[in-house]
Swiss-Prot record:
Its main location: membrane. PANTHER family: ACETYL-COENZYME A SYNTHETASE, ACETYL-COENZYME A SYNTHETASE 1. It comes from the Bacteria. It comes from Bacillus subtilis (strain 168). This is Acetyl-coenzyme A synthetase. The keyword Metal-binding applies.
Length: 572
């Protein structure tokens, strides 16, 4: 990294002095900003919406929504009313009670946000699903969570295998002309009849409110449960890291199927009473730059992949738009390349602030802040109230510049509460000494900045999304031509990594480009488009351990011309 440190930004930031705040901050201070600190009545969705609707912010715009067909805005008062309506629909027609799982499987739209907030208001645990998921991925998540209700659209309805999900009692369909039946309910018709007044279910701090499924390198996706207490850290990171101010227009580009789109696309901004922008439809530079110009976006949270795609569109494209409203730009999902930081400085005249966290942590943990110098390529420093370290495999802290496990001291407010139906997996995240081990390798420099070095396991980060190789391999071997498959992440200048599959064919099948395309489509239709291999290489056989596990590190060594390391466990 030959880029010089970018100096702290002058200005009236919410986090004024990092070192001083880090020394003295206590999470109890953050609790004072919530109505439940006085009333004892606690619900994250109430705090995000109703608290403002019952204050001087009631007529403030909470949501700007736009896509190719819709251009709408909703005040906090209207958000309260529409989410109340959604809560009443789920209660009356879905028999939803406290603790029930309600999954939302639909593209971005205002209704998605009304329904998620309404579900949480009545005590349900909301589970967002990415719209690109195919039947197999949807079934796995609904089955594991024992979801009682799923909300979808007519286009996605056929991907929900209702007859294979005995716990699923009701399917609500939003938009279109879906006929209500035994367990299919037309949401739009039901919502018209419902009151905008709702009896809110008051919760305890440790009651669940969000269930996000995340991929690992082995096993099926795991359900990470977050509890209402997480709102404390979601609020505080919105204040410090996003640096949200009363007058800000804020845009997080992430889909709510991913944890960033929920935590930083819903809760952090609205807990802070900010105006939130949601853009539906596909990415295009014209749409994105046009949104910033049209709505006067001040704070923008996106991902390195998106920034690289904007880079690819050329500086001339950016120059066509007035982007001077931007005050603060942030990135998440994968390490931020120095060339993207350089480009951001040139095109926006702004620093891009990298942030690090993961589904399991529930909110940002290690970040770059406006009040602090940025070392390009560094993750930054831990937020006040969080202790981070580099530890060895026994949990001993390592000195500066020694690479090891990136670990966080247990007990921050947004830490996952459990892994759904898998307490043993939850316990496996922790080391002696109370350390949560992230699965990332990193080192810390002498000034306390952390530097990401890669995944300890094999999870693939493609376009900012985590893809578990095991899930892709499992789908691949369902194809009749495939005997065995191994999947790795291959470095890519635009997407960070792409998925590459090594495949051994069954007897009677011959390698061909036509077969590659058929296999790619098979995974796309069975899992999701982003999970389909972009490269496929046929092999006579794949390297395996004696117990039969594919040795992905050997595949990666083949691909990148690296030493394969210890091969003592490989079968002959």
């Amino acid at each position: 990294m030959n880029l010089k440190a970018l100096p702290a930004i002058e200005g009236d930031h919410n986090l004024k002095n990092y070192e001083e705040t880090y020394r003295h901050f206590d999470w109890a201070e953050a609790e004072k900003h919530f109505s439940w600190h006085e009333t004892g009545k606690l619900n994250a969705a109430y705090e995000a919406i109703d608290r403002h609707a019952e204050s001087f912010r009631k007529n403030k715009v909470a949501l700007y929504y736009k896509d190719a067909k819709r251009d709408e805005k909703y005040t906090f008062k209207e958000m309260k009313e529409e989410s109340n309506r959604a809560g009443n629909v789920l209660r009356r027609y879905g028999n939803v009670e406290k603790g029930d799982r309600v999954f939302i499987f639909m593209p971005r739209s205002p209704e998605l946000y009304f329904i998620m907030l309404g579900a949480i208001k009545i005590g349900a645990i909301a589970g967002p699903l990415f719209e690109a998921f195919m039947e197999g991925a949807v079934k796995d998540r609904l089955e594991n969570s024992e979801a009682k209700v799923v909300v979808t659209t007519p286009e996605l309805l056929e991907r929900i295998p209702v007859d294979k999900l005995p716990h699923l009692q009701h399917v609500f369909v939003v938009g279109g002309e879906a006929e209500s039946g035994t367990n299919i309910i037309n949401y739009d018709e039901a919502a018209k009849q419902e009151s905008t007044r709702l009896d809110i279910e008051w919760m305890d701090k440790k009651d669940g409110f969000l269930l996000h499924y995340t991929s690992g390198s082995t096993g099926t996706p795991k359900g990470v449960l977050h509890v209402h207490e997480a709102m404390i850290q979601q609020y505080q990171t919105g204040k410090w890291v996003l640096d949200l101010k009363e007058e800000d227009i804020y845009w997080c580009t992430a889909d709510p199927g991913w944890v960033t789109g929920t935590v930083y696309g819903i809760f952090a901004p609205w807990l802070n009473g900010a105006t939130n922008v949601i853009v539906g439809g596909r990415f295009s530079p014209e749409s994105w730059y046009g949104t910033i110009e049209q709505l006067g976006v001040n704070v923008w949270y996106s991902a390195p992949t998106a920034f690289r795609m904007l880079m690819g569109a050329g500086d001339e494209m950016a120059a066509k738009y007035d982007l001077t409203s931007l005050r603060h730009v942030l990135s998440v999902g994968e390490p931020l390349n120095p060339e993207v930081i350089r480009w951001g400085h040139k095109v926006f005249n702004k620093r891009i602030h990298d942030t690090w966290w993961m589904t399991e942590t529930g909110s940002q943990l290690i970040c770059n802040y406006p009040c602090m110098d940025i070392k390009p390529g560094s993750m930054g420093k831990p937020i006040p109230g969080v202790e981070a370290a580099i530890v060895d495999n026994q949990g001993n802290e390592l000195p500066p510049y020694r690479m090891g496990n990136l670990a966080i001291k247990k007990g921050w407010p947004s830490m996952m509460h459990t892994i759904w139906n898998n307490p043993e997996k939850y316990e496996s995240y922790f080391m002696p000494g109370g350390w949560y081990v992230s699965g990332d390798s990193a080192y810390m420099d002498e000034e306390g900045y952390f530097w990401f070095q890669g995944r300890v396991d094999d999870v693939i980060m493609t376009s900012g999304e985590r893809v578990g190789p095991f899930e892709v391999e499992s789908k691949l071997v369902e194809h009749p031509a495939i005997a065995e498959a191994g999947v790795i992440g291959k470095p890519d200048p635009v997407r960070g990594e792409i998925i590459k599959a090594f495949i051994a064919l069954r007897e009677g099948f011959e390698p061909s480009d036509k077969l590659k395309e058929e296999i790619r489509l098979f995974v796309k239709q069975g899992l999701a488009a982003h999970a389909a291999p972009r490269e496929i290489e046929f092999k006579d056989k794949l390297p395996k351990t004696r117990s039969g596990k594919i040795m992905r590190r050997v595949l990666k060594a083949w691909e990148l011309n690296l030493p394969a390391g210890d091969l003592s466990t490989m079968e002959d």
